[in-house]
């Protein structure tokens, strides 16, 4: 049985930063992804926001709090916005090729929702470059990286991490891995609403007893090509691209990302016109080629039809400023368990996210989790292997049962269940007590069906069918948690809108948590340092 100080789940910016920081701190570090290595995810889609040309980060901090409808933890917002310029500098010194202004500094533009120009990027190569920089740092510090490793069970003793059970699809076996600390830093659950990926790490901790926070909040990405899962960076709008209806009438994009997504969602045949980007066009060359390969649309000559989809789920594993997963209250920690990036809910975004803040959140939470995990594991010993050995045997039996030939005349496959999930979500066009309860009833039925999903492949080697079964089951559980959290929030705030409670209420100025049994709880909103509001709720 392998034993590592720190195991990191994921392969995006947060996971790479966490793994590199942990290894740099002296911890033996293993990084695992359920898919092939090298997939950057969506965190870097809209660049990185930092107050490079401002005397202080106060405006960035206040824009973030306002966009989050005052549901952000203000001490976290202060810490992350204060470190934003440092994050830009680190990426630049490690090789990221920003677009530059006449002074040679990273070029910043004013993205929607920001009061000042502060969002920088590298055009369509931003995500690839961020991924490359992260991989180079991980290799530099000796992180061991493995792909096609599917996490099955988080093994713990009284909410203290012992290790985890993993399906190794490279060697075709179920194995146990001992660890002192586990950092969950893979994807969120936005893939449940379309054709994207659902992270397994969040569900892993959820099944182990961790209550998820703020699951009702998610944002729609406005520039999604209709009928596909291709999301275009909103940075195109800063370079001269415009959104209008098919008739040519330009849309009023409003002042926030939510306004833009709603305007596009309500428009008649909305399209993106990126034919006149001028000198900025070369920065988007690889994106234009990708769109042409996927859709046949030449963005240099044609407009692109749009249809907003859920692109970012804000809720996730509740963490403190060190990246530790908290349970019930800020004072209780699921010992040895950390989270970062898309799988976590740091309190930075609140009820909606600003462009450029998503990558900032991933980098900051990844660094915090990796640094603290390395320091903490240095003084810890490994737990007993007894529970882990039993969990491996149980997982082997469960997987073997799933792979057995099913002689039943009627079987349920992932595609059918996923289509039913999407249909249930699409039919819920607005949120109210009745519509959310109806959706929850449908989801409970799907959750029951998901327990007996049919697996066509019988081998453990590269069994993508089995991986999709796990993802489908996780997606349904995550959406159920989101609906239960939405039922508990009897108000409209940020990206979450209810028909029967159209106004925000001070009574719900707190975080809502929900566990696997459906028990709803609360987590207090954190003010700034010293217990004072940095920006009082309005």
Question: What is the role of each PLM region?
Answer:
Residues 33-65, 69, 223, 233:
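Conserved N-terminal glycine-rich FAD pyrophosphate-binding loop of Rossmann-like flavoproteins
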Residues 1-3, 21, 25, 38, ...:
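Glycine- and aromatic-enriched mobile tails/lids
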Residues 204, 210-310, 372, 376-378:
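An anion/pyrophosphate-binding glycine-rich loop and adjacent beta-alpha core
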Residues 181-230, 347, 355-372:
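Glycine-rich loop(s) and the adjacent beta-strand/alpha-helix scaffold that form part
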Residues 6-30:
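N-terminal Rossmann-like FAD-binding beta1-loop-alpha1 element of flavoenzymes
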Residues 87-173, 178, 221-228, 233-234, ...:
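Conserved redox-cofactor binding core of oxidoreductases
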Residues 2-4, 171-181, 333-336:
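Core beta-strand elements of the Rossmann-like FAD/NAD(P) dinucleotide-binding domain
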Residues 27-34, 214:
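Short beta-strand "acidic-cap" motif of Rossmann-like dinucleotide-binding folds
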């Amino acid at each position: 049985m392998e034993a590592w100080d720190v195991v990191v789940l994921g392969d995006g910016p947060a996971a790479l930063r966490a793994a590199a920081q942990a290894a740099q701190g002296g911890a033996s570090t293993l990084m695992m992804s359920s898919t092939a290595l090298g997939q950057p995810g969506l965190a870097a889609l809209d660049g990185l926001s930092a107050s490079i040309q401002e005397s202080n980060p106060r405006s960035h901090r206040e824009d973030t709090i306002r966009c989050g409808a005052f549901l952000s933890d203000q001490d976290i917002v202060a810490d992350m916005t204060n470190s934003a310029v440092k994050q830009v500098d680190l990426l630049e010194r490690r090789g990221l090729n920003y677009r530059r202004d006449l002074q040679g500094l990273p070029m910043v533009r004013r993205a929607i929702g920001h009061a000042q120009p502060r969002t920088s990027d590298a055009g369509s190569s931003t995500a690839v470059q961020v991924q490359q920089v992260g991989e180079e740092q991980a290799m530099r510090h000796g992180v061991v990286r493995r792909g096609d490793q599917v996490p099955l069970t988080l093994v713990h003793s009284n909410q203290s991490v012992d290790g985890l059970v993993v399906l190794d699809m490279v060697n075709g076996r179920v194995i146990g891995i001992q660890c002192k600390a586990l950092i969950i830093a893979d994807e969120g659950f936005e893939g449940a609403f379309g054709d994207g990926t659902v992270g397994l790490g969040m569900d892993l901790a959820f099944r182990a007893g961790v209550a998820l926070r703020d699951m009702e909040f998610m944002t729609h990405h406005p520039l999604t090509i209709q009928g596909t899962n291709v999301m275009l960076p909103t940075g195109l709008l800063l370079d001269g691209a415009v959104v209008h209806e098919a008739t040519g009438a330009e849309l009023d994009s409003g002042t926030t990302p939510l306004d833009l997504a709603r305007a596009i969602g309500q428009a008649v045949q909305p399209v993106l016109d990126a034919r006149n980007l001028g000198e900025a066009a070369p920065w988007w060359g690889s994106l234009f080629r990708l769109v042409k390969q996927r859709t046949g649309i030449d963005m240099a000559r044609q407009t692109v039809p749009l249809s907003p989809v859920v692109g970012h789920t804000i809720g996730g594993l509740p963490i403190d400023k060190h990246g530790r997963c908290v349970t019930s209250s800020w004072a209780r920690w699921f010992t040895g368990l950390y989270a970062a990036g898309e799988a976590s809910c740091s309190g930075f975004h609140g009820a909606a996210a600003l462009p450029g803040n998503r990558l900032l959140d991933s980098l900051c939470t990844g660094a915090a989790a990796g640094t603290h995990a390395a320091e903490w594991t240095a003084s810890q010993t490994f737990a007993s292997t007894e529970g882990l050995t039993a969990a491996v045997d149980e997982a082997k039996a469960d997987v073997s049962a799933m792979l057995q030939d099913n002689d039943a005349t009627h079987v349920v496959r992932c595609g059918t269940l996923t289509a039913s999930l999407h249909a249930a979500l699409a039919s819920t066009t607005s949120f109210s007590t009745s519509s959310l309860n109806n959706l929850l009833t449908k989801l409970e039925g799907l959750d029951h069906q998901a327990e007996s999903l049919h697996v066509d492949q019988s081998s453990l080697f590269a069994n993508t069918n089995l991986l999709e079964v796990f993802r489908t089951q996780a997606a349904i559980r995550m959406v159920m948690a989101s609906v239960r959290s939405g039922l508990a929030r009897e108000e409209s705030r940020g990206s979450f809108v209810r028909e029967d409670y159209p106004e925000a209420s001070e009574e719900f100025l707190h975080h809502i948590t929900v566990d696997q049994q459906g028990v709803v709880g609360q987590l207090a909103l954190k003010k700034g340092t010293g217990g004072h509001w940095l920006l009082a709720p309005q």
